[in-house]
């Protein structure tokens, strides 16, 4: 598979990078669910991970050293609620791509429902909701309500 030169990415501003969208599609690697691993975090470690690696700006969660092309749009963010689900996948241009965020709340657990953030804007590296649905199913199957959880294919903490 081709590799997009890093200097192309480093020397592009957000607008130019968006214009590379059609080209970059040729460089993405095929994503498989077995490529990811589960990391269980305490609430304190989850908050530290978020504050260390992300910032929140006008309804975007973004890597601190990147712009929103590698981020995720979301409806609402409840940092101090019960459960958090964050999926990150390593892509071919050395960026971590956020693929989903799902919040769980106590009253939803009682009624067996989930507050699913359905207006997630996945960037063009992956097939959006199709991937999120697979991650969601795996997350529910493995769900431990006593822990916060993060999915990643790399050791990030």
Go through each PLM region and give its residues.
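Conserved N-terminal entry element of GNAT/NAT acetyltransferase domains
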Residues: 1-45
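Charge-rich, solvent-exposed alpha-helical interaction surfaces
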Residues: 23-27, 49, 138, 142
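Active-site rim helix/loop that mediates acceptor-substrate recognition in acyltransferases
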Residues: 43-85, 90-92
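Short coil/loop residues immediately preceding or within conserved phosphate-binding loops
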Residues: 82-84, 112, 117
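Short, low-complexity Ser/Thr-rich regulatory SLiMs
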Residues: 91, 106-108, 124
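Conserved beta-strand in the GNAT
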Residues: 96-107, 116, 121
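Conserved acetyl-CoA-binding loop-helix of GNAT-fold acetyltransferases
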Residues: 122, 128-142
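Conserved beta-strand-loop-alpha-helix junction that forms the acyl-donor binding cleft
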Residues: 150-157
């Amino acid at each position: 598979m081709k590799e997009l030169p890093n200097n192309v990415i480093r020397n592009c501003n957000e607008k130019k990078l968006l214009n590379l969208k059609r080209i970059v599609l040729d460089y993405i690697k095929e994503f498989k669910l077995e490529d990811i691993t589960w990391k269980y975090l305490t609430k304190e470690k989850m908050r530290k991970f978020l504050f260390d690696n992300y910032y929140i700006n006008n309804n975007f969660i973004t890597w601190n050293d990147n712009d929103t092309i590698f981020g995720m749009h979301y409806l609402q963010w409840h940092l101090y609620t019960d459960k958090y689900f964050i999926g990150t996948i390593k892509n071919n241009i050395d960026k971590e791509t956020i693929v989903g965020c799902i919040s769980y709340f106590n009253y939803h657990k009682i009624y067996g429902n989930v507050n699913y953030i359905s207006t997630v804007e996945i960037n063009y590296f992956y097939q959006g909701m199709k991937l999120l649905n697979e991650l969601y199913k795996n997350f529910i199957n493995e769900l431990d309500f006593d822990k916060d959880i993060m999915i990643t294919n790399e050791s990030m903490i």
